[in-house]
From Swiss-Prot:
GO terms for cellular component: cytoplasm. This is D-aminoacyl-tRNA deacylase. NCBIfam families: D-aminoacyl-tRNA deacylase (TIGR00256). GO terms for biological process: D-amino acid catabolic process. It holds the Pfam family Tyr_Deacylase. GO terms for molecular function: D-tyrosyl-tRNA(Tyr) deacylase activity; Gly-tRNA(Ala) deacylase activity; Ser(Gly)-tRNA(Ala) hydrolase activity; tRNA binding. An aminoacyl-tRNA editing enzyme that deacylates mischarged D-aminoacyl-tRNAs. Also deacylates mischarged glycyl-tRNA(Ala), protecting cells against glycine mischarging by AlaRS. Acts via tRNA-based rather than protein-based catalysis; rejects L-amino acids rather than detecting D-amino acids in the active site. By recycling D-aminoacyl-tRNA to D-amino acids and free tRNA molecules, this enzyme counteracts the toxicity associated with the formation of D-aminoacyl-tRNA entities in vivo and helps enforce protein L-homochirality. Homodimer. Keywords: Cytoplasm, Hydrolase, RNA-binding, tRNA-binding. A motif (Gly-cisPro motif, important for rejection of L-amino acids) lies at residues 137-138.
Length: 151
């Protein structure tokens, strides 16, 4: 499971001209679910996002989590994060989870985020979305859940 997270001063998702999810200060999470991902990946990423200290303290040091700054989460499904551009000019999405599994695990990620107590807004799975954001910094990170080891 992969996520691109961005520290934002505001973000919103628009579907068919209507705002379906919005936050002020917080983290925009673009989430890609891959084949082989499981609930443990969604739980791990949610906990990582909730605790990651990417907001500045009084001294200007990245030392505070989204929870500590009373921020929000905007979670948007993004299957293209599972795209492979290594060969040719057209991305391959062979590693992306099938839509039903992607939707289920995206939903579990949102559930896990909400269980942390952080207000969490969402986009709409498989919708054509317009994502508007003001990246604060800019601050952007790529996260990937640890792959399970056989053992």
């Amino acid at each position: 499971m992969k996520a691109v997270i961005q520290r934002v001063s505001e973000a919103r998702v628009v579907v068919d001209g209507e705002v379906v999810g919005a936050i002020e200060r917080g983290i925009l999470v673009l989430l890609g679910v891959e084949k082989g991902d499981a609930e443990r990946d969604a739980a791990w990423l949610a906990e990582k996002v909730a605790g990651l200290r990417i907001f500045e303290d009084e001294a200007g040091k990245m030392n505070l989590s989204v929870r500590e700054v009373t921020g929000g989460i905007l979670a948007v499904s993004q299957f293209t994060l599972a795209g492979n551009c290594a060969k040719g000019r057209r991305p391959s999405f062979d590693t992306a989870a099938p839509p039903d599994e992607g939707k289920r695990l995206y939903g579990r990620f949102v559930d896990f985020m909400r269980e942390t107590g952080i207000p969490t807004a969402t986009g709409i799975f498989q919708a054509d979305m317009k994502v508007h954001l003001v990246n604060d910094g800019p601050v952007t990170f790529i996260l990937e859940s640890p792959k399970a080891t056989g053992g």
